[in-house]
Amino acid sequence: MTTRKRNEFLDIVSDDDEGSDRGYDSAAAEESKGRLAKRRKTHTRADDLSDEESDFGRSESEDESKTRLKGKPKSKSQTTERSNDSDDEDEADDGEKMQVDQYLDTTAAHSPSQSRSQSPSASSVSSKPTKLKKKPLDKVRPPKKNKTGVIYLSSLPPYLKPFALKSMLETRGFGPITKVFLTPEVPSNSAPRRRSNKRKSYADGWVEFASKKTAKICAETLNATIVGGKKGGWYHDDVWNMKYLKGFKWADLMEQVQRERSEREAKRRIEDTRARKEDKVFLQGVEQGKVLQGIQKKNEEKKKKKGETGPGEGEGSADAAAAAAASELKVRRLFKQSEVKMGRDKVKDISTLEDDAKRVLSKIF
């Protein structure tokens, strides 16, 4: 029996044997193919260097094998085993090369097809521009007709509030009410002032309904009738006085209210200006009277100092003093003005003045 010089269990297993034990893994194969393709595309120089190193390693291994063959004669069985191993390695290398070539062929075959498949889609996208749908413009709608109706209330119950009036009409089925306008009652100057009562009373008013029909029916049914309600109510015995205003709109009412308000303000403005003028005239008179009183006092003091009135004159002197004072009040005050030195009335020869003026002007110009 021949003894085994190599221990198969202690030797390092080759990569080919490991691959045969693991079996075929498609994911791993695809990863390895991808890695090989990437290396060939990007790192060509590194691959060349690695090939040179592998060739150099193979040459060294061949030299070592030759020296061993020369030194030790081996049996036929060992030589046949090694030859078989080398054949297997060559076949494995050929298989790997074939796989790489097939991968390259498949990538080359798939790339034009993919480019063709992608190109029509891109061309279709570019050739078909996005069509913007034109939205139809909104048709110009005609303005809605104003179908509101307005009624006029010539008189209102005392201390009736606007929301109470609205609730009264709506409870009787006349609605919907859109707007209510009541004019406050202006108290007359002769009427006594009531400071304790803070409630307001209104003279007349206007009520706008959403439809003309309800306004007409309301005016026809409630006009000249009592307000009604609870028997002991505050407004039970008061009478409605209302009229439907044909062709009258709320805008017309606002114009009328504004016009009346402007007229009222204009009258008040005129009255204010008139009152200011009267006050101004009165103050001027008061000031003038004070001035005259001061003048009288000064004149009396001067007369007393001079001693014009003697002790034996009696009643005649007193009457004369009163008459003099009355005459002084009526006399206008005169102020002495300064005279012009070279007036025309004082210049005798006007021609000489004109000659002098001409001479001076001729020198200047």
Curated annotation (Swiss-Prot):
This is Pre-rRNA-processing protein esf2. Its main location: nucleus. It is found in: Nucleus, Nucleolus. Residues 20-34, 55-67 have a biased composition (Basic and acidic residues). GO terms for molecular function: RNA binding. Belongs to the ESF2/ABP1 family. One of its GO terms (biological process) is endonucleolytic cleavage to generate mature 5'-end of SSU-rRNA from (SSU-rRNA, 5.8S rRNA, LSU-rRNA). It comes from Neosartorya fischeri (strain ATCC 1020 / DSM 3700 / CBS 544.65 / FGSC A1164 / JCM 1740 / NRRL 181 / WB 181) (Aspergillus fischerianus). Residues 1-146, 293-322 are annotated as: Disordered. Involved in the small subunit (SSU) processome assembly and function, and in the 18S rRNA synthesis. Required for the early cleavages at sites A0, A1 and A2. Residues 149-239 form the RRM domain. Keywords: Nucleus, Ribosome biogenesis, RNA-binding, rRNA processing. Residues 111-129 have a biased composition (Low complexity). InterPro entries: ABT1/Esf2 (IPR039119), ABT1/ESF2_RRM (IPR034353), Nucleotide-bd_a/b_plait_sf (IPR012677), RBD_domain_sf (IPR035979). One of its GO terms (cellular component) is nucleolus.
